[in-house]
UniProtKB/Swiss-Prot annotation:
Part of the ribosomal stalk of the 50S ribosomal subunit. Interacts with L10 and the large rRNA to form the base of the stalk. L10 forms an elongated spine to which L12 dimers bind in a sequential fashion forming a multimeric L10(L12)X complex. Pfam families: Ribosomal_L11, Ribosomal_L11_N. Forms part of the ribosomal stalk which helps the ribosome interact with GTP-bound translation factors. The keyword RNA-binding applies. CDD domains: Ribosomal_L11. The keyword Chaperone does not apply. InterPro entries: Ribosomal_uL11 (IPR000911), Ribosomal_uL11_C (IPR020783), Ribosomal_uL11_C_sf (IPR036769), Ribosomal_uL11_CS (IPR020785), Ribosomal_uL11_N (IPR020784), Ribosomal_uL11_N_sf (IPR036796). The gene is rpl11. PANTHER family: 60S RIBOSOMAL PROTEIN L12, LARGE RIBOSOMAL SUBUNIT PROTEIN UL11M. Gene3D superfamilies: Ribosomal protein L11, C-terminal domain (1.10.10.250), Ribosomal protein L11/L12, N-terminal domain (3.30.1550.10). This is Large ribosomal subunit protein uL11. It comes from Desulfurococcus amylolyticus (strain DSM 18924 / JCM 16383 / VKM B-2413 / 1221n) (Desulfurococcus kamchatkensis). Keywords: Ribonucleoprotein, Ribosomal protein, RNA-binding, rRNA-binding.
């Protein structure tokens, strides 16, 4: 039982049998439309975002398995803010504003790829990313929000999401 794993980036919910997917899959003689449908079904919640996808193909049986990764923190924050691209000058040019709860939700989604051990630490990491791309949080500079997190201002919101964090964002 020989397996081959292929990693590609696709736009959520919009994979097509054309390049790069079709030509990459055709040597393995899998049912490409089935693979595309499986990818689109699995990535539909990330529409408009570039999503890492891993396709594992059993060379003998032509069966396949699709695993979807999580988009980058930057991509998730930009989607939350409704922005198209990060700013080149985050100190002076803001591209959007999101709520603290949106930051928490991004932190939970990114749980497995962040080195943070606690929800509080993960939120502070995501706030750092928000600051670097020009997104404000509740109308404030994310650095200021990080200080408020340290001071306990957001403890009530964090405690509401603590259980979801401990389950791994499932």
């Amino acid at each position: 039982m020989v397996k081959k794993t292929i990693r590609v980036m696709v736009e959520g919910g919009k994979a097509t049998p054309g390049p790069p997917l079709g030509p990459t899959l055709s040597p393995y003689k899998v049912n490409i439309p089935q693979v595309v449908k499986a990818i689109n079904d699995a990535t539909k919640d990330f529409e408009g975002l570039s999503v890492p996808v891993e396709i594992t193909i059993d060379i003998d049986t032509k069966e396949f398995e699709v695993r979807v990764g999580i988009p980058t923190t930057t991509a998730l924050l930009m989607k939350e803010a409704g922005a198209k691209q990060p700013t080149g000058d985050p100190a002076h040019q803001k591209i959007g504003n999101i709520s603290f709860e949106q930051v928490v939700k991004v932190a939970i989604l990114k749980r497995d790829s962040l080195t943070a051990k606690t929800l509080r630490a993960a939120v502070k990491t995501v706030l750092g990313t928000a600051r670097s791309i020009g997104i404000t949080v509740d109308g404030k500079d994310p650095k200021e929000v990080q200080k408020l997190v340290d001071e306990g201002v957001y403890d009530e919101i964090l405690s509401r999401y603590e259980e979801e964090w401990s389950k791994g964002g499932q």
